């Protein structure tokens, strides 16, 4: 969908006057935004492979500085207890390098158009998705922080299929608006979390694809399902939408392919939706199935997952934190009223 386009029937939004615009953003946010745009310009000016190399080196430097390194290594130990300390260390470095490369790829989105996305992606399961869309109920496309999730959404849009992504708003609204503008330029419509309950049903009725990144810790509001053999608080939103609205569900990832070229395999496969009449049980079952699909993909290339997030931060209600291992942390915060899908 072109940048600035609006859903049919929605009221036009008046852009704030310059003085009002300035008051909306703090000085710190304006400086942060200026730095981000400078970095974007610098990376975009480089040839793609050079930008990829710069991102990789930046990631490795951040690893050496130790930023969130303990979190990454602890997550890897929890997910792969059978692996050696050497493997954990090596995979940790590779995860930082991957993060740097994909950050550079996202900064270069302004350089890409529809054909550039097509040239960089290899779709898998496309016929399956087109068949699902032929029934006119839209598709729920659920992914995780693996590979490059922005490319996953852009791949759908580049093939001429309307897609809207449910996103979490960034704290810096200037950065948020810039990122959303880049998404819109590639044909990806944006839905904020608070807009989702009203907009998702309308878009599904128009046979659109709804993209959700749903693998972060959901605190007390989540449903606990196995993830790498451990109960993880997971957002129930994707499953609830699918069960209540009757849309087919696809598990999707955009995995970076090996080699010097920047290319991705974007796979999407249907996940069976079982309706027994017990919404809570069905929600848990579907959420668990989606988590299992994501885990299977992560095992193919563990370094491409976002291990920087404390995925097992919240303990199940009946589970007490272990003071000996330190692997489970109790959280006393109330349920999150604004779940984080992105």
Predicted regions and their residues:
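Short, flexible loop segments at the rims of nucleotide/cofactor-binding pockets, characterized by
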Residues: 116-121, 168, 185-191, 228-229, ...
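A conditional alpha-helix N-cap/helix-loop micro-motif detector
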Residues: 119-123, 146, 172, 190-193, ...
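Catalytic core of membrane glycerolipid acyltransferases/transacylases, capturing the structured
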Residues: 134-194, 217-223, 256
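Non-catalytic C-terminal accessory region of glycerolipid acyltransferases
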Residues: 2-27, 38, 46, 58, ...
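Short amphipathic alpha-helical segments and helix-helix/interface helices
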Residues: 129-130, 153, 179-180, 200-201, ...
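Active-site metal-coordination segments of metallo-dependent hydrolases
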Residues: 70-71, 169-173, 231-235
């Amino acid at each position: 969908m072109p940048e600035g386009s609006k859903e049919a029937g929605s009221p036009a939004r008046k852009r704030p006057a310059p003085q009002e615009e300035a008051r909306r953003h703090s000085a710190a946010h304006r400086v942060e935004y200026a730095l981000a745009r400078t970095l974007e310009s610098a990376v975009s000016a480089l040839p793609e492979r050079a930008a990829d190399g710069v991102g990789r080196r930046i990631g490795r430097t951040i690893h050496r500085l130790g930023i969130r390194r303990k979190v990454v290594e602890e997550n890897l130990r929890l997910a792969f207890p059978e692996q050696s300390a050497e493997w954990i260390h090596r995979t940790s470095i590779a995860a930082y390098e991957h993060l740097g490369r994909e950050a550079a790829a996202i900064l270069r989105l302004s350089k890409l158009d529809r054909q550039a996305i097509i040239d960089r992606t290899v779709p898998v399961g496309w016929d399956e998705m087109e068949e699902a869309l032929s029934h006119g109920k839209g598709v729920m496309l659920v992914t995780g922080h693996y590979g490059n999730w922005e490319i996953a959404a852009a791949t759908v849009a580049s093939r001429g299929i309307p897609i809207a992504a449910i996103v979490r708003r960034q704290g810096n609204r200037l950065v948020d608006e810039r990122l959303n503008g880049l998404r819109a330029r590639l044909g990806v419509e944006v839905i904020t979390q608070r807009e989702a309950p009203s907009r998702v049903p309308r878009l599904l009725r128009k046979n659109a694809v709804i993209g959700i990144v749903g693998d972060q810790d959901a605190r007390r509001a989540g449903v606990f399902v196995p993830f790498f053999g451990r109960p993880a608080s997971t957002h129930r939103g994707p499953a609830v939408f699918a069960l209540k609205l009757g849309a087919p569900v696809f598990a999707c990832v955009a995995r970076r392919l090996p080699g010097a070229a920047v290319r991705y395999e974007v796979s999407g496969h249907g996940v069976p939706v079982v309706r027994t009449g017990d919404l809570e049980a069905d929600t848990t079952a579907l959420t668990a199935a989606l988590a299992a699909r994501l885990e299977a993909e992560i095992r193919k290339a563990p370094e491409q997952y976002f291990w920087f997030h404390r995925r097992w931060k919240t303990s199940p209600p009946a589970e007490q934190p272990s003071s000996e291992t330190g692997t489970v942390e109790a959280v006393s915060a109330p349920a999150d009223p604004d779940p984080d899908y992105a």
